[in-house]
Each structure stands twice: as structure tokens, then as C-alpha cells.
Amino acid sequence: MKALKSHPVIAALTLTLTASLAGFSLTHSARRGVAETRGALPDLPEANGAATLLPNGWHITPAGTHIPLPGDLPLKMVFSPDGKYLIVNTAGWHDHSVNVIDLATNKVAQSVNVGKNWAGMCLDQVGKTLLVSGGGSPEASFLKDAADMGATSEQLASFHHPILRLSYADGKLTPLTGLDIPGLSDNAEKIPNDYHINRERFVAGLAAGKNGAFYVVNTQNDTVYKTYVDADFMKSAPISVQVGYRPYACALSPDGETLAVSNWGDQSVTFIDTQSMKDYGRIKVGSHPNEMVWGKDGRLFVANSGSNSVSVIRGDKVTETIKTSLSPTDPIGSTPDALALSPDGKRLYVANADNNDVAVIDVSDRRESKVLGFIPTGWYPSALAIAPDGKTLYIGTGKGLRFRASAPATTPWTRTQPVSGLKYDYIGGLLSGTVSVVPVPNLHQLYAYTRQVYANVPKMPVEIERRAGPRALAERSLHNIKHVLYIIRENRAYDQVFGDIKTGNGDPDLTVFGEQVTPNAHALAEHYVLLDNLYANGEVSEDGHKWCDAAYATDFIEKAWPNSYSDRGEPDADERLTDSPAGALWDNCRKHGVTYRSYGEAADFTSTPDAPPVFTGDKGLAGHVNTEWAKFPFGVGRDTQRAAIFLKELNEAEKTGQWPQFMVAWLPEDHTQGLKPGAYTPVAAVASNDQALGMIVDGISHSRFWKDTAIFVIEDDAQNGPDHVDAHRTVGLVISPYVKRGQVDSTQYSTASLVHTMELILGLPPMTQYDRNAAPMLDSFTGSPDLTVYANIGSKVDLEAKNPATGPGAAASNRLDFSGPDRADPDALNAILWHALKPGQPLPAPVRSARLARQ
């Protein structure tokens, strides 16, 4: 198999660069068969020009001009038949809309609020009817909000349709009655009262075929439907076929005879004969296949979000695997999730959502495709389209170009209408969608774009042997640590807890759980290092725990949580879609001979009165969990009881000398249950969490293991708590004899920074691009250990205080679901907590900063 060369123009440009770029070559090509590509990551200086620094440490410098959308997370783009308009949906947390962009003015000419939709959209073959996937059945609370915000009876009734329908003519959309599929529709007569959620539906991909046929992918029941419609009604009962686990997209071959279906959770593509609707084959591809596009030559390109790759299928096999990451040797973390093919079939464009770029690939030679370069985008590109003339690329970004500052509170139903009683917005509402308009670059411009994309990646220090000074000494000291305890807590922002610490960048006016409530957290922050520039990678618990455990959230999680948290529902899925293909920290430990144990994190149990608990958590933790934790699921028991279980095992380890190298513990009580009658008060709940932290640190520091132990503490997310810097800024601690004393470390860190530092200690390789590139916490460590022990500080508040049966906030809290983390509306819960603890004071706005690094 011959080695492939880089593009000659790119190679020529390389020779003209300075010495720091010597050797950079985009030798980033696919080979014949399924062999992967080779390449090199250049050592680039910081690019010139304005850049936005994200909370995760990555920069964005989006190319082109930008069209704001009324909502977030655009997932599909469709051109009008005459090519004058681009139709774009938004399917995130706030406005779900279908938007018509006038390409002559690059402005949204029309926006239709559809309430809910998802990942499928197509025009029929005559270009007069637009079909849009309806996603799942919304929660009753969403319907109530929609009704309260002025939704018409027709709009409310439309939510029961699995497929939305709009007429299209001359750049204008007109809503029509939606389409039903037997078994997938809701009972419209029960909307909004006595509404029953249809758990069998979550409609994703759509494709329009010949003679009025169209094809519907239902992710929820692993089924594809074929049916026919005319202008007014469905002509016949649909024909269905089972495909792989959780299908996502469908694409018709150029001749219309074959339908390809990407099986999102099954690492495969199913091929269906459109005449007989028979499955005639399934081809294995990469992890988490999502979007697909056919070439006129019969090749099918499949984006594999969990493999940093595109599979090229020709005939009955994969003939190429094209790596789309910045280097072909990169671990996962690029997340290709959208494709566009130039009209001449020579260029493939691939949106790398988590790299914030579009890969440009020469696919003109069917034997060997080549990655030519990358175009920088906004935050999380999620949709692509190439103009019919091939001259302009349209890039939809799921999270926008920058952070949106404080604004009046809105609901998922409509972003444009303020909500009475709530003054400020929820974190989901702070995300924004855009369409970037980028002229297709020539190779010289593409090379400049490529340099910028590389410059946007967080820069890592050089190898330790090349270092000198305190940071080198600190990193070498990490190797003296043999045991790591990783404590994950729930949902607190920095200023909520540490805003009253004068030495840090805090705002005491925003502090609701200050030193009086959390004396141990405060003492530990002041005795060791105060981390006042630490940010959660995740927005909410659904992605936050994934970032904590695996330094990555899959594209399924990123596309599902905005729907779930806005009460529009989400498709059911197991670890095949929810978990990182690279595994979690405990999987990393297992692969490299590091002992590990979980105390509650990802360690679910089911139980019955007549049988012992059965472990149903992460498969990689089977046999490595503390089963006593099953007695205290979320909302049951106290964190002090959980800490006692941990200390019991620590005492046993003292006797044997055997203690795991890596341990992870979940202490969730600081989530609180609001003012739910009979539950522990928010202050008592957070104080119990703080006592548990103090107990654990006290116990470890007095043990034989203290001399070579490090404890890392993080919140899974900041959940939009009040913070004057950014709504992602969160509470974290690092505690060890090798941690500095009495210092403030204002280095910008993220959740992935903690993961990276723990990996360095344990001798583990990075799992993803995010932990690999995150700044390790070297500035918090020292080469001179201090073995001073820590003594738990007793609670200064009543740990047993409970909420009264009535009073402000009781009724609102009773309406919330506290059966699991974030099942309660986090925005409502934060408002309840603020008004309970800061009576008479207006709830402050969540702040979103454009640049977070301390100058």
C-alpha cells in the first residue's frame, strides 16, 4: 500500500514558512481500503487577529460573515429549488424554528416558530412542500408553557404530529397540518389536558423520494418508514423496516433506488431497497455514524462523530477511512457531525463540532482522498451546506460566536418574549445559533485558515525534560503521588460559594453558601490553593458528568440535552450512544493496570424489597464499586452518611495497606431539594455536603496514605448559578501535601484540566483531545511536600433543619422533580434558592464573558 503525499500547493507553502513551522505538512490523506492516514501537528505561533476564548480553553475565530438565528443548534439546511434561499432549522434549548435566509441579502427573511423539531428536513421533489421531523412528544410542562406564552390551539395541536409540514413558494413558508404515522402520533384531543407522552417516537432523518414517496427515521424504535403524501393527506399506510440501534439520518442514492440509514448507536449503515423496502445489507463504519451524503459516482460518505473520521462506502465495502481531526493520530474529540459535497463532487466539507472547524477534503481521486486544510468556525458547527454554484459554504454553529450577556428570562417556547416572575436567563437560553457565510477559499486562503485553526487549539508545554524552574519541579512532584481521590459534587457556581473570599476574584453580593455554610470548603481553599478561574466544560448535569468522567460529551448528548432540559423530550439510549467511545477514567485505569473504585459515581443500582441491590451502572465499574452506596441514591440519605462509608473502607485499608490508586466519589447533596416541604433546607443540605468533604479530607490526612495522596474536587457543572465572571465558572479544590499553601491560582483551568492532571499523576494517557490539551494544574503544585494534617471544621448551621410545609417557595419546589440530578428545572431551582437565601434582592444575571483569561 503506497504512502500518499501532501497536496503540492500546501507542500510548497510549507517551504516558505519560518523555522518554527519547518516540517509542517498536511500529509493527511486517506489510503485505499480501510487504512487510516498519517500526518503531523505543526508547532504554530499564536495567530494574529481577534479571538474569543471559550470556557474550555479553546479559541474560536470564525471565518466569513454571520447571520444570527432566533434559536440555537441548527441541524439541517436545505436550498430552495431556485437556489436563492437557504432554509435552516434550530433545534436546541430555546426557539425551535424554521428560517428562510435570503441569500441576496444574507438575512433571515422569515422565521416560523414550530415549537419543536429535530434533525430531519427536506423539500419534496417538486419543491413545494417542506417536511420537518417533529422529534419526540413534548412534556406536559412544555405544552403548558407554550399555552401560557400565547401559542394558538393550532400550534398546540401540531405538537402531536411526528412530522411537520409547511408549504414553500417564492421564499415563503406557510404552516400546514402535520403528518401522522400510526403508532407515532399523540392524541390531539388530549392536548394540553390529560396529555399522554408517546414514548415510541423520536423522529430524526427525512428524505424525499420519487412519486411523492418519503422516508422517515424514527430513532426511538429503530425503524424506517416509507409513505406517500399529496397536498392534503397521507395516501396509504406506511411500510416499515427495522434497522440498527438508534438510527439517525437517511440519504437516497442518486438513482433513488437505495436508501442509506446511519445507525447512530450501532457503528453501521443499513442499505434498503426503496421499492421493496427490504434491508439488503449492513456495513460496519466508525463510531456514532450520523450525517451522510452521496456522490454522483455512487460513493457514500458517512460522518463518524466518535471516530474523528468519514467512512467512504463504495459498493458493498468501506474503501477509505478519512481522518478529519487536526492530526490523524489525535484521540477522539473532533466530533464530525455534518457534511456537504461540492456540486462537482470533488470537495467534501466536514464539520468538526468539537474542533470548531470545517475540514476540506479533496475526494476527486476515488483511490486516495486528501485533507487539504481547515476553516475556522464558531462554537460547535452542527450543519453545513454548499451553494449550488459551489462558490459559498454555509456553516451552522450550534452554540454561536460568543457568549450572550445577561438578558430578560425567556422560555424554550419563545426567546423573544420575557417571562414574568423570572428576571434572568437559564444557561440553555444563553447559547445562540448562527449561520456563517464563507466564500469557498482557494488553497492559499485555506492555508491561512488552517494556520488559524491550529492556533485556536490550547497550547501545551513542551516535554518535561526541556523544562526548567518551578513548573518542571511541580510536574516531577506529581510522580510522588500514588493515590488520587476525585470528588464530584453538584451544580454550584464560584460566586455562590467562594464569592466571599477576599483574596480571589469573587463578588460577595452573589454568595449564598458562604463561609458560614461551607467552612471546610473555605478553609481548604484558603489553606491550599484558591482556584478562581476554573470553568466547567459541561452546561448541565447530563453532559457535565460525562466531561467529569471522560473529558468528552458525545454528539448524542450535545443534541439530546437541550431538548430534554427544555421539556421537549429526548430519545432513549444506552451507553452505546451516551458514553465516550474512548471510555471513562476507570476504563483508562483498567487498560493500564491502575487499581480503581467508585463510590457512587456512575454506579447505579436497582433493588426490590426481597432482593439485594443489583448493579446497573457503568459496565467498566462492575466489581469496582462500593455497594453500600446503593442505600443512598440521589435524594436519599446525607452526604455525611456517604462520607462515613468511604471512611470505613479507608480504615480497612489502613490495616491491609491496600488502597486503590484511583477513586471517584459522588457527593450530590449540594444540589439541594429547594424548599420542598419536609426536605432538608438548602443551607442544611449544602452544609452536610461540606461536612462530608471535611470528614473525608480529615480522615485521609490522618492516614498512612496522606504522604502520597491528592484529592481533586469539582462540581459537575455550574448550572447557571450567579457568578459575576461567567456562568460556567465553578467551585473546585485540589488538596495534597504536594499542593502549595495559601496561594491563589488564577490560571484558566477547566474540568478537563483536573482530568489531565490526574492522568499525569497516575501515568495514564489522555482519553480525548480535551484532556490532552487542557492546561494541567502545575501552578497549584510544589516540589516540597507539607505533611500538615487537616481537621474537619464542625458545622456552623443546623444540619437537621427541614423546610416547612408551607411558605414562599414550598409550592414551587413541590412541583419540581428531585428524583435525580437536574430533573428539577435548574433555572426555577436557582431562583428558589436565591430568593430563599437573599430575600428581597433581585436575582442577578448570569454573566457570559468573551475572554476569560486573566490578563
Where are these regions (language model features)?
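N-terminal pro-sequences and low-complexity stem/linker regions of secreted or lumenal proteins
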Residues: 447-855
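Bacterial N-terminal signal peptides
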Residues: 11-23
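Bacterial N-terminal signal peptides that target proteins for export
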Residues: 2-12
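Intervening/peripheral non-core polypeptide segments
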Residues: 1-4, 106, 112-118, 122-132, ...
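Short amphipathic alpha-helical leader/targeting segments
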Residues: 13-14, 270, 291, 404, ...
